[in-house]
């Protein structure tokens, strides 16, 4: 019994190895090394769960001590019969009475040996339980790794699908840009044709003016010839004063000519008054054209203000994009620093990462709101160009409803709706250009009226003072032509301003679309980075209890070996996995 107890005590003091612990025996002097139950409990305390194991062992020791105390009165008669030596010889004399202190010491040592054996058995069972737990945790770890691999494959497949969708959208946008370029070329061709017509009309007017000057010179030459003929007739009348009949005939002819000239004079005066009235009407039309020019200038100023506002919004979006790009660079630098660090992520760093993720989510929502505001601005421009107040109120109500749902997804403003709004804006601008074309026709009508006025002034050139009237008519015509040219110039400027505003608005919308695409790509990158960080922290959290459960009691009987090497090997094993 004592030898078996010594063997169990030796197993308790050896390392916790199930294969080699059963065949180890203590030498003869090993019984002196075991002193008391408290010393044995201190030697075999296990770091994995020292409190629970010590409490259980103390309870078992208390039960064993109570049982031994109850069995002590019957042990003295059993010990005494074992003292005689077995054999066939004569009975020996009784041995001398043993010392009771020595017996109590021996019994105490036997009790300690029994307790040590039971402690060794309990430690062996504990070691087996820990090995089973280790196998179960290893199995759970492999299952989780397989699940993470499946999720990784699913995320890769989604990324490929999204990449195909974005390529399709890019191709659609390229076709839209090509169509817009074709339309711009057509508009430029129309403008060139209008310029050619204008130059042709100016050339025709200059040619007509030259012909009018030639006709005036011929009329003056005819007038000179007529005056010379009158002088010749007067001389003839003086020469033939003697002949009364000829004188009477000549007198009658002269009276007829005077009457004809007086009638012609009255007709010219009537035409002059009509010309003055038409000049007044032309001045009224010029004033109306000036009013229209002022209206067009005000509209161009409004368009400039809208363009300036859109440029400011574009600058704000660019500034926010630069800020987000800087934050992404900061996150990548922090990620590189975290990957180069050898220590594991603490709870404080995880909290900071979660707070940074929340801040990034808030910034992403802000950028979505900015994209929605740009979309509302495009719709507001469309409604303003239509001049429909009800549409403006509808846009304001839609914007208020969408601002109430700020946590909506990025698909609240799809690329299709922006494209339709852009097409609406293009149609409105085209309709405005078409509305300006009647003014061009009106100017052409006024040009024909000026031509008619020139024809009427040609008739008035035969009056008594043809040079003054001709100069006045030429001055009026030049003023009318200058006003017409100024109006045409203002109209061309308005057209150019509208075209530049349209192109700048298209560029701003295209830049906002590019920013939204970059935002979605950045969101995907951030999701991947956060998933990778969560996976690393999860693996590290799983490696910590495994490292704590790894047996570190190998150096109790062989020497004090550092336990950090085992922990490092275990961390390297999980990193390889």
From Swiss-Prot:
Compartments where found: Cytoplasm, Cytoskeleton; Cytoplasm, Cytoskeleton, Microtubule organizing center, Centrosome
GO biological process terms on file: Golgi to secretory granule transport; neuron projection development
GO MF, any single term: small GTPase binding
Biased composition (Low complexity): 390-399
InterPro entries found in the cross-reference section: Spindly/BICDR_Dynein_Adapter (IPR051149)
Annotated coiled-coil segments of the chain: 121-379, 443-528
Coiled coil found in the keyword field: yes
Motif stretch (CC1 box): 116-120
Any one cellular-component term (Gene Ontology): centrosome
Main location group: cytoplasm
PANTHER family recorded: BICD FAMILY-LIKE CARGO ADAPTER, BICD FAMILY-LIKE CARGO ADAPTER 1
Record family assignment: Belongs to the BICDR family.
Protein role: Acts as an adapter protein linking the dynein motor complex to various cargos and converts dynein from a non-processive to a highly processive motor in the presence of dynactin. Facilitates the interaction between dynein and dynactin and activates dynein processivity (the ability to move along a microtubule for a long distance without falling off the track). Predominantly recruits 2 dyneins, which increases both the force and speed of the microtubule motor. Component of secretory vesicle machinery in developing neurons that acts as a regulator of neurite outgrowth.
Subunit note: Part of a tripartite complex with dynein and dynactin, acts an adapter linking the dynein motor complex and dynactin. Interacts with KIF1C. Interacts with RAB6A and RAB6B; interaction is specific to Rab6.
Record-given protein name: BICD family-like cargo adapter 1
Source organism of this protein record: Mus musculus (Mouse)
